[in-house]
Amino acid sequence: MSTLLHLSASPRGAASESRAIAATFLDAYRETHPDDEIVEWDLWDGSLPEFGPAAAAAKMAVFAGADPQGDEARAWRNAIDTFRRFDAADRYLFSVPMWNAGVPYILKQFIDVISQPGLVFGFDPEHGYTGLLEDKKAAVIYTSAVYGPERGPAFGADFQRPFLDDWLRWTGIDDLAAIEFRPDLATPDADTGRRAAHAAARDAGKLF
């Protein structure tokens, strides 16, 4: 039995396009994976620890082979606990709206909290980084209100998908699927794209 963790980066609840497409994906997944566990994680639920001075100092201490102390130790434990919650799953679904050409800051906060040496990555001065997440796969739902790949620069740029795809591969997760719905506000026939995105999510969910 596998565990699929859905991480939602949209704070818009029932009005969220990315969450609606994710629901279609998950319904299809349940049909073909009836014994698997599905866990929901709303990244806006207040459970993410902050990643401030103590956490940054703890990360560098661990990088240097030292043990964090005091506030740094507490921040490090919070990072480990957050990572373990993520690592408990072997399949991931991210629903990610575009914010200002990139990802919502809550998703960046999540990434900053768990991207720690010995947890998500290893590092060798000669050979560089090694992703430590093995035997995992991820699907990502990308939505945008205005940006579209065939629209001009006045409609924005995409630092959303390149960033998250690169981070996932950096962690060691290179079995990736993506469903895109864009744009949903700047296109007269948005319903056509919406239906196509839900159909793609349904197909991807069944095969995931």
What are these regions (language model features)?
Residues 3, 37, 137-138, 175:
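Residues at the starts of beta-strands that form the adenosine-phosphate
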Residues 117-122, 174-175:
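Short, structured loop/turn "capping" segments at alpha-beta junctions
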Residues 11-13, 147, 185-187:
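Short histidine/acidic/glycine/proline-rich micro-motifs that form metal-
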Residues 89-90, 135, 173:
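Short, well-ordered alpha-helix to beta-strand connector turns
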Residues 150-208:
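Glycine-rich phosphate/pyrophosphate-binding loop and the adjoining helix
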Residues 122-170:
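Short, glycine-/small-residue-rich phosphate/pyrophosphate-handling segment
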Residues 1-96, 101-112, 116, 199-208:
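N-terminal beta1-alpha1-beta2 submodule of the flavodoxin-like/Rossmannoid cofactor-binding fold
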Residues 9, 143, 181:
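Cofactor-binding loop segments of dinucleotide-utilizing enzymes, especially the Rossmann-like FAD-
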